[in-house]
Amino acid sequence: MAKRLQAELSCPVCLDFFSCSISLSCTHVFCFDCIQRYILENHDFRAMCPLCRDVVKVPALEEWQVSVLTLMTKQHNSRLEQSLHVREELRHFREDVTLDAATASSLLVFSNDLRSAQCKKIHHDLTKDPRLACVLGTPCFSSGQHYWEVEVGEVKSWSLGVCKEPADRKSNDLFPEHGFWISMKAGAIHANTHLERIPASPRLRRVGIFLDADLEEIQFFDVDNNVLIYTHDGFFSLELLCPFFCLELLGEGESGNVLTICP
């Protein structure tokens, strides 16, 4: 499931997620920049599809940018249907995740339904304390496929994903070697693998998390834009893995925004 989703959302030329996708007459889809570069390397403006090797006839260069708008318009409905299909597939694995207050930092407060968390206001020197306030979700998983969504809204700094149980949640070292597989926002969006930057908008508001414990993968989606933004792989599926949520502590005079697990 996870591998197929990634393949559907990736360009066969650059092997990255589609950027301004375009469909050729043979119906294969590529990034616009990738296929334009591929075709323009042939001086008579004829090229074969990189996948099926069918010859693709291309309009004159000055017409290319105009014609691509028409092609993109024709693709819009089918791409939207594909995005909705992927989203519906993910929701077949939807879990009723809530926050486990028994595992929480004392600096967090929760809604009555245990779906929302917020940092308390604090008024002391943060340099003497851990910068993070964390909590686990429930249930935890050791096998199978599981999906949940988190509304991060206006929260300035957050970390989401899974961690093995037990793991040292009081540490600031939230890295895979310590049992954490997460994405985080601290200005830009990053993965916790050597702080690798993720090509996602800093205005990302809702994050979808798909855990395939059998394939040892966790995928992160920009739900509003139906985009896969990152994949962690290679962790041990025999571990008990718990949903993980973390908010940065507040400085003096700051007020915290709410992080919410979507029902």
From Swiss-Prot:
One of its GO terms (molecular function) is zinc ion binding. This is Ret finger protein-like 4B. It comes from Homo sapiens. A zinc finger (RING-type) spans 11-53. One of its GO terms (biological process) is innate immune response. Coiled coil: none annotated. SUPFAM superfamilies: Concanavalin A-like lectins/glucanases, RING/U-box. One of its GO terms (cellular component) is cytoplasm. It comes from the Eukaryota. InterPro entries: B30.2/SPRY, B30.2/SPRY_sf, Butyrophylin_SPRY, ConA-like_dom_sf, PRY, SPRY_dom, TRIM/RBCC, Znf_RING. Keywords: Metal-binding, Zinc, Zinc-finger. Residues 76-263 form the B30.2/SPRY domain.
